Design a protein with these regions (language model features):
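Active-site-facing alpha/beta catalytic cores
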Residues: 2-163, 184-185, 189-200, 204, ...
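Conserved, mostly hydrophobic/aromatic
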Residues: 180
Length: 222
């Protein structure tokens, strides 16, 4: 069990509350310095009270060093997964990094992100010339998609999982693994559907030995 503590909020239009990092007190003006302190305290509090290290979303690659010592998992979201700096930064991390499929639902984009993260790179990070050795624990997260009409396209069904398994088989990737995000476009943002979706994913996993190896877990929202 990894508590999911997301301290940043990606906004589709750039407007609205952007999370604890930007605005630790919603009733006051944004304060990034106070936000950095607040997000560290949040993750440390979870560790102290539960004994469980937490997960966060890497929305801003240059900020992840503020939490480098307190996280055990990071996810790269649907709107960031095609960004090169996110992929390169993930290649230098020593914890598992999950790459979500983009909002279009395109699985090839997600897998290309995993390929990039698993390879070594040489790039500029926070003003420094850095080299990475690649992150063999980079993997995929299925979160569903949205078509051009704004309709949700779930990708947690048995056929979707088998399609991902087949695509993994065509790539030279280490440690093939997938997490199913049972909210977002997989549930149509109907949080009560998560229980049913988890049951279906577990059934598919138990039914097929290949999926039992590939599907490592589920991601839920409270």
């Amino acid at each position: 069990i990894i508590p999911r503590i997301y301290t940043n909020k990606p906004r589709t239009t750039g407007e609205g509350y952007k999370g604890l990092l930007h605005q630790p007190d919603p009733d006051k003006a944004p304060d990034l310095l106070a936000g950095i302190i607040a997000i560290r305290k949040m993750h440390i509090r979870v560790l102290e009270e539960t004994g469980l290290s937490s997960a966060d979303e890497m929305l801003y690659p240059e900020n992840r060093s503020y939490l480098d010592d307190v996280l055990s998992y990071e996810a790269i979201g649907a709107r960031s997964v095609e960004n090169q700096q996110h992929r390169l930064t993930a290649s230098g991390m020593d914890i598992p990094v999950g790459m979500k499929n983009p909002t279009s639902g395109d699985l090839s984009v997600m897998l290309n992100s995993v390929i990039a993260a698993q390879h070594p790179h040489h790039f500029i990070y926070r003003g420094c010339d850095v080299e990475t050795s690649g992150n063999e624990l980079a993997h995929t997260i299925l979160r569903g998609g949205v078509n051009k009409y704004g309709q949700t396209i779930p990708n947690y069904h048995y056929e979707d999982l088998m399609r991902l398994y087949d695509l993994y088989g065509k790539k030279n990737l280490k440690n093939p693994a997938a997490i199913v995000d049972v909210n977002h476009s997989n549930s149509g943002k109907q949080f009560k559907e998560q229980i049913r979706i988890v049951s279906e994913v577990l059934h598919s996993r138990n039914y097929n030995p290949d999926l039992r190896k590939l599907i490592k877990g589920i991601m839920i929202e409270s």
